[in-house]
Amino acid sequence: MGLMSEYIDRRMSAKEMEEELLMLISKYNKIRNTYLFVYAGAIGKPIPDIPLSMDDYYIVFDMLKDVNADNLDFYIETPGGSGEAVEEIVRFIRNKFSNIAFVVSGEAKSAGTIMVLSGDEILMTNSGSLGPIDAQVKIGRSVISAYDYIEWVKEKREEAEKTGKLNPFDATMVAQISPGELSGVHHTLKFAEDLVVEWLPKYKFKKWDITETRKIPVTEEMKKKRAREIANELMNHARWRSHGRSIKISDLESESIGLKIIKVDDDSQLR
């Protein structure tokens, strides 16, 4: 029986649930010798909405600035959001804490995945998932997938080259796209990739000294090359097909990605 079923059967009040949660966090902190911070975004919102924004950075800053600890375990649950906000949050927590682990039991998609890849460790339950990396951009009054936007423009360009025309609706839409806007979308995607390529070697790979198979020393260039391969794989929309696709532990540990994940369900103290 799961904990939630147990709590329902016990008819726990909101206050009792809060006390139970604080007790579990305290127990977790002792087991891991860490400070657990819980961040949960608006999973119920559609992906195009941006629940992870600069407002979240200011909240995280206010809640963690006075914490006196070397280790931070950051529980994250979000469908995605702003890459710039992720950069600010990571810059702050990396400057404040010596060791950071990210804990994923629900969804940490898109920008949430980028943040998770800045950790020294990644802890996941079987129910947890990351997602394809795809920056979100604001076009007019809507926030949409940068990749989908670029693919749509590419599709319309190819259609125009092949047939010599576009239907009136598409022609009107394309006419409103400026070169600067299109360039900005390309830069947004590259920005997301750059963060992953910078953070993986610096943090997740910092103790990767010897290769597992050939047992040869790992150079900084090898770390950067591997980080770029992982970023490219997570941005490979031909493989994942959907922005909201769940990337599970088995996917992350597969040969094509090859990340080491700490499996919470295999740890009798944590599960």
Task: Name each model feature, range by range.
Residues 1-107, 113-114, 118-271:
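Terminal-region recognition feature
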